[in-house]
């Protein structure tokens, strides 16, 4: 084992935060220094030149410190027996650079702690601050790290002696293995193995437990129900299916695959043919949808829990039909009170929590980062979400008790597209190869399906930890590229049948695959790729290692499939063959035995059906006491409630522009305020048709009325999607995620009531279908504290996600109030019809109460009338702005619209009934519309004609104040800036805790700056002019290499931009160049695309660059290309970072910087303002002086120069091509207008001859006007960024 020092691991402010944590823990620590240390497992000693090459590969990030560190060494490494994603990708780079003697690279962080002598207890406390016990260990000596590379002998399976010891043997195994088997399931297994006359093996029991867990089998939703002594006619699932039976319209696949599919639009699908040439293929682009939860793992270890939750849902989408394409994501979190240090709110009590789960604050600090990081690296935009905090002692259905989300909801979902011929699974032919695609088996995530089916507190802590998985999104991206290549082949697609590997690992996935295909299978255990040879058969078969799919491929198609995988560098293995007989055999060649030998029907067939005999309960809760509520104080509290407050800290960490197909994300208007009601995507680059998603959830209402909570969730999702141009209810399909504390008094009957309200009544009445969903039935946390039994039980929680097909994405209405549209009026549509019920509201919550009566959708006709009227208005462009009324009531709706439009309001409540508090803060269904004053009465009359109450409530005000009156009486008045400050303080506090606090403060101050102009546009050219048109007509299109490495994810939109400019865009993978299949000699131009090559493990873009510099063939190819006078190149984002590391082979690039970690130390996804500079760059000719917004999505975009002199030389060279600026056109020095902290706002630079240009922002994602989060009304189809690509075509003549 070689040990190689690396760069400092922590920035100054990270060290400072660590020191503060030490002080808070009363540790006598004076100083901490941390640096990366690399470990190389070698097959033989390296030669001197090889050692030097390895050291160069492992040189990245900040400069390595020259000093010898002092103090107590605490060396944090990945847990022995696991292989970190960093390791697998860094090892790939070493191999691609020709270092075959490197068996494996691994990395740890060496902490050197200078302190007074620490007691054993203090050392344990310190270790707790330095490592994540879920995935890491702390060593006191570098030499001890060789345990990471230790190989152990495989362990055999174990049998459970049922034949001799009977049922008792299985009862003991059930507890010891954490199988969560029910009594009747134990009977079933004993009976079947006695019949088979053999003992079950541990692997078979674990496989059965996973396949039949509540998590996988949804026993409660399929159960027979008796409520209050009366047998119920339908199961929960049958009531959900009733929505499909009533309205099957436009549904192509429901209840039988990894996701549901509905009919989409016809558009030109853009992808490369088998020769790599991109083009449009006009065809139906059907829409798939799925929403998952990952609650249990997120409670234990939020980052990997949320990351793998997102990853699993993305795999569900990709594994739909015979392979499909995930497109856009949504997310959601429900947690208990945050109790932010220094910002604890009056309603946040201190009830405690068990040690084995983390706090709500930790979940919301780490969980969203995990989910966002996975989506970012995979390359799926995260466009929609919800966030609720709830934890309160209330009088509900079970009397007075604490209700809340100690067991959180972590929701991950999204939509994708699928080809018509691939919607249905194919036939698994007898003899077909059964394949696992993706990463290796690792000893992690054991028993996740069974563990998540228990209430938190029933399983032991070790089992809890074992049931959390780890994430490697770059591997999943590679697998998705394989799936993409397969579906792009149309009827020649080699995939017959595909499933993702999720709960239960291969033990659930392979049996499900063959069973669903009507086949059996013979498998060889030792063919499963595994990085841990000491694993037992159970661990190999049942672990939940992520980023894996199982699929069947006909034997004759195996060479084609193999070639695709090798090109994409996606690992795969043939593990078995499909058989005619529905029997499952798993052979182990190492021990020469069969750990599994079972008829499939024993595993998946006739397991006992559950019966639920339950009693209903009625909630009795006093009315909300209004007499002590002051409107001004209520405003302060409600705007500080995380459910209502600014959610920037959850949004800017997630890429929202990747694919180039995003039309509407969470951010709205020139000031990019996160208040959007729905997300909208374009179907493709050649159409205005698209897709929309929204969410709805009103979970606290269930503490008063289960049915109302469910109806309001459905209704809210419709109110949120109503601003998109969809047309008909029948074009909207819903996903329903049901969370409940099954077995808790009153909850089971309440769940039945809620499902019935939606499945049997509301949805059929509105022609809405629920073709997909998920349930999580163990939403209760129990523990002991100071000798007392404590519980926190979640409300019954229904989260609805609505998916619609959009007719014209240009018609989408957002909450941005417009002060440039002449005289306008604000209308309130009130579906609550003046009832003003306050039960379960945010107002009640912030005063520590629940209230007595929940708001409800009393008549479905009200929602139908509203939606149909709204859709006519949207299609005619009669609505200027729209925002629904929900959490925080009318007051919140109005001020959020004011924030988005940067305007004041003059509101008059006199048309509304009730007290001030009721009128402002009730959360009945409704919405506010801004319309032209000339149209206001006519529009109000249209709503009235549809049976929907509609009131004039005011207009915009020029004084930047929000003033609310009741006739002449002033009810409330405050400046917009003061309200925005209140609303944004929660996100500021969270950002300051999690990110660079200096950046967080700068952003908070910018939100309070009345003079901030937001995004502005000033162009020096006409964007509607196509300067390339004369050249395109000349004949053959010049060839453009659309270059990607493993992990790159922005290549398709880049190909589309160059295609529109008249180039032949060709897909070129680095493996094509390294293998010699393709030469750069063929191309006039090259573009290195954005993404996460090798997951950015050796510095962003650096691993990619080193695989070129240290590979003879690649270095030669690229050197020759850059030396050619006629060639040109563009590097964007990851491609920019990569090319900046190729300075030694790019003429005229000596002055270039390298790109390092953003100043905020956070991935930044922003829509930022830049100005084009005067430079020789061929891409920016004729554009100098133009100021316009552009998509920014990166974690390492800070331009770092070797010295101040080097920066001065770069400035003097005249090659700076782009700078971040503010709305006045001044160089942006403050965050977030300068999102990465680069000196002088630098974000684009070129060679001295202008042939090679680097830029961190993404012009390819915004070359269409509709892909810009905000733009002036007068822009046409092409945004100004299209000029760049056309300039490249003009340059070639």
UniProtKB/Swiss-Prot annotation:
SUPFAM superfamilies, sorted: Class I glutamine amidotransferase-like, FGAM synthase PurL, linker domain, PurM C-terminal domain-like, PurM N-terminal domain-like, PurS-like
Region spans: Disordered: 305-328
Binding-site positions, Mg(2+): 677, 716, 720, 884
Localization terms from the record: Cytoplasm
Domain of life, source organism: Bacteria
Metabolic or biological pathway, per its Swiss-Prot or TrEMBL entry: Purine metabolism; IMP biosynthesis via de novo pathway; 5-amino-1-(5-phospho-D-ribosyl)imidazole from N(2)-formyl-N(1)-(5-phospho-D-ribosyl)glycinamide: step 1/2
GO terms of biological process kind: 'de novo' IMP biosynthetic process
Function of the molecule: Phosphoribosylformylglycinamidine synthase involved in the purines biosynthetic pathway. Catalyzes the ATP-dependent conversion of formylglycinamide ribonucleotide (FGAR) and glutamine to yield formylglycinamidine ribonucleotide (FGAM) and glutamate.
Record's protein name: Phosphoribosylformylglycinamidine synthase
């Amino acid at each position: 084992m070689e040990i190689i020092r690396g760069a400092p691991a922590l920035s100054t402010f990270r060290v400072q935060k660590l020191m503060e944590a030490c002080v808070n823990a009363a540790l006598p620590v004076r100083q901490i220094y941390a640096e990366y240390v690399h470990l190389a497992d070698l097959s033989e000693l390296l030669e001197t030149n090889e050692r030097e090459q390895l050291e160069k590969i492992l040189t990245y990030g900040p400069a390595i410190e020259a000093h010898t560190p002092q103090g107590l060494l605490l060396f944090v490494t990945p847990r022995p027996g696991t292989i970190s994603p960093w390791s697998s990708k860094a090892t790939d780079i070493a191999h691609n650079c020709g270092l075959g003697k490197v068996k494996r690279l691994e990395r740890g962080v060496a902490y050197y702690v200078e302190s007074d002598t620490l007691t054993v207890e203090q050392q344990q406390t310190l270790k707790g601050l330095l490592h994540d016990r879920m995935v890491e260990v702390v060593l006191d000596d570098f030499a001890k790290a060789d345990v990471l590379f230790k190989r152990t002998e495989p362990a055999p399976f174990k049998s459970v002696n049922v034949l001799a010891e009977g049922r008792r043997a299985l009862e003991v195994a059930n507890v010891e293995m954490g199988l969560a088997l029910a009594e009747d399931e134990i009977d079933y297994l004993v009976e079947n193995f006695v019949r088979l006359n053999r003992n079950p093996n541990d692997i078979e029991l674990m496989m059965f437990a996973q396949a039949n867990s509540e998590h996988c089998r949804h026993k409660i939703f399929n159960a027979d129900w008796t409520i209050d002594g009366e047998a119920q006619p339908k199961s929960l699932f049958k009531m959900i299916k009733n929505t499909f039976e009533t309205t099957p319209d436009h549904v192509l696949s429901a209840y039988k695959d990894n996701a549901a599919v509905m009919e989409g639009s016809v558009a030109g699908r853009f992808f490369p043919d088998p020769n790599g040439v991109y083009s449009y293929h006009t065809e139906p682009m059907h829409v798939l949808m799925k929403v998952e939860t990952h609650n249990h793992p997120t409670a234990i270890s939020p980052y990997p829990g949320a990351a793998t939750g997102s990853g699993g849902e993305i795999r569900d989408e990709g594994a739909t039909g015979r392979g499909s394409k995930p497109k856009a994501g949504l997310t959601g979190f429900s947690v208990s009170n945050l109790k932010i240090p220094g910002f604890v709110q009056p309603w946040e009590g201190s009830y405690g929590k068990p040690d084995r789960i983390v706090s709500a604050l930790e979940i919301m600090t780490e969980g969203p980062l995990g989910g966002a990081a996975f989506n970012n690296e995979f390359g799926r935009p995260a466009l929609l979400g919800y966030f609720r905090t709830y934890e309160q002692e209330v009088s509900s259905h079970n009397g007075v008790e604490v209700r809340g989300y100690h067991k959180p909801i972590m929701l991950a979902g999204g939509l994708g597209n699928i080809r018509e011929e691939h919607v249905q699974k194919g036939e698994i032919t007898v003899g077909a190869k059964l394949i696992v695609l993706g990463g290796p088996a690792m000893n992690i995530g054991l028993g996740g399906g069974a563990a998540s089916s228990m209430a938190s507190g029933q399983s032991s802590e070790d089992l809890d930890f074992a049931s959390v998985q780890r994430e490697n999104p770059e591997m999943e991206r590679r697998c998705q590229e394989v799936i993409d290549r397969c579906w792009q082949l149309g009827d020649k697609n080699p995939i017959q049948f595909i499933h993702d590997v999720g709960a239960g690992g291969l033990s659930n996935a392979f049996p499900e695959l063959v069973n669903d295909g009507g086949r059996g299978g013979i498998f060889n255990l030792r063919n499963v790729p595994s990085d841990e040879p000491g694993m037992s058969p159970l661990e190999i078969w049942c672990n939940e290692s992520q980023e894996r799919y199982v699929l069947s491929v006909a034997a004759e198609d195996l060479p084609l499939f193999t070639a695709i995988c090798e090109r994409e560098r996606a690992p795969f293995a043939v593990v078995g063959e499909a058989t005619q007989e529905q029997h499952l055999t798993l052979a182990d060649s190492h021990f020469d035995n069969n750990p599994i030998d079972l008829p499939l029907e024993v595993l998946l067939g006739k397991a006992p059906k559950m019966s639920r005999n339950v009693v209903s309960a009625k909630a009795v809760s006093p009315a909300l006491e209004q007499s002590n509520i002051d409107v001004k104080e209520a405003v302060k509290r409600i705007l500080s409630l995380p459910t209502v407050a600014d959610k920037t800290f959850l949004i800017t960490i997630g890429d929202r522009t990747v694919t180039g197909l995003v039309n509407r994300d969470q951010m709205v208007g020139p000031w990019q305020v996160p208040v959007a009601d729905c997300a909208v995507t374009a179907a493709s680059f050649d159409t205005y048709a698209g897709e929309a998603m929204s969410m709805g959830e009103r979970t606290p209402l269930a503490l008063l009325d289960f049915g109302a909570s469910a109806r309001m969730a459905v209704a809210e999702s419709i109110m949120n999607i109503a601003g998109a141009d969809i047309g008909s209810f029948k074009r909207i399909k819903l996903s329903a995620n049901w969370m409940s504390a099954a077995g808790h008094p009153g909850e089971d009957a309440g769940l039945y009531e809620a499902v019935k309200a939606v499945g049997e009544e509301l949805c059929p009445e509105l022609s809405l279908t629920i073709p997909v969903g998920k349930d999580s039935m163990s939403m209760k946390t129990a523990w002991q504290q100071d000798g007392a039994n404590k519980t926190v039980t979640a409300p019954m929680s229904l989260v609805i996600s609505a998916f619609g097909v959009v007719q014209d994405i240009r018609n989408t209405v957002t909450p941005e109030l417009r002060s440039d549209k002449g005289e306008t009026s604000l209308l309130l549509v009130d579906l609550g019809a003046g009832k003003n019920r306050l039960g379960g509201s945010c107002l009640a919550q912030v005063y520590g109460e629940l209230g007595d009566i929940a708001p409800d959708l009393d008549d479905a006709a009200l929602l139908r009338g509203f939606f149909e009227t709204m859709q006519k208005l949207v299609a005619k462009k009669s609505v200027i702005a729209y925002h629904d009324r929900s959490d925080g009531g009318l007051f919140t709706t109005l001020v959020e619209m004011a924030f988005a439009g940067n305007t004041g309001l003059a509101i008059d409540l006199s048309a509304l009934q009730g007290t001030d508090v009721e009128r402002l803060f009730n959360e009945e269904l409704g919405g506010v519309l801004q319309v032209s004053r000339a149209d206001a009465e006519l529009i109000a009359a249209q709503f009235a004609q549809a049976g929907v109450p509609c009131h004039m409530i005011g207009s915009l005000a020029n004084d930047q104040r929000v003033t609310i009156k009741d006739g002449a009486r002033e009810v409330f008045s405050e400046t917009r800036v003061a309200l925005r400050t209140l609303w944004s303080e929660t996100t500021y506090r969270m950002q300051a805790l999690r990110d660079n606090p200096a950046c967080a403060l700068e952003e908070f101050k910018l939100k309070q700056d009345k003079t901030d102009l937001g995004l502005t546009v000033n162009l020096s050219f006409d964007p509607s002019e196509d300067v390339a048109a004369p050249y395109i007509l000349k004949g053959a299109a010049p060839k453009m290499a659309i270059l990607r490495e493993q992990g790159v994810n922005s290549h398709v939109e880049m190909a589309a931009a160059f295609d529109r400019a008249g180039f032949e865009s060709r897909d070129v993978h680095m493996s094509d160049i390294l293998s010699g299949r393709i030469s750069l000699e063929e191309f006039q131009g090259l573009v290195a695309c954005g993404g996460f090559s090798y997951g950015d493990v050796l510095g962003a873009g650096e691993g990619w660059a080193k695989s070129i510099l240290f590979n003879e063939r690649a270095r030669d190819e690229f050197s020759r290309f850059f030396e050619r006078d006629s060639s040109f190149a563009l590097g964007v984002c990851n491609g920019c970072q990569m090319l900046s590391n190729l300075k030694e082979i790019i003429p005229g690039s000596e002055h270039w910087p390298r790109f390092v970690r953003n100043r905020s130390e956070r991935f930044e996804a922003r829509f930022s303002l830049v100005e084009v500079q005067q430079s020789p760059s061929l891409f920016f000719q004729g554009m100098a002086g133009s100021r316009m917004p552009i998509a920014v999505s990166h974690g390492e975009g800070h331009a770092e120069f070797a010295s101040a002199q080097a920066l001065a030389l770069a400035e003097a060279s005249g090659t700076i091509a782009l700078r971040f600026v503010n709305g006045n056109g001044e160089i942006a020095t403050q965050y977030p207008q300068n999102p990465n902290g680069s000196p002088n706002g630098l974000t684009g630079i070129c060679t001295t001859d202008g042939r090679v240009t680097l830029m961190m922002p993404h012009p390819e994602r915004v070359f269409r006007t509709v892909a810009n989060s905000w733009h002036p009304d007068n822009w046409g189809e092409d945004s100004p960024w299209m000029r760049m690509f056309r300039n490249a075509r003009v340059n070639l003549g």
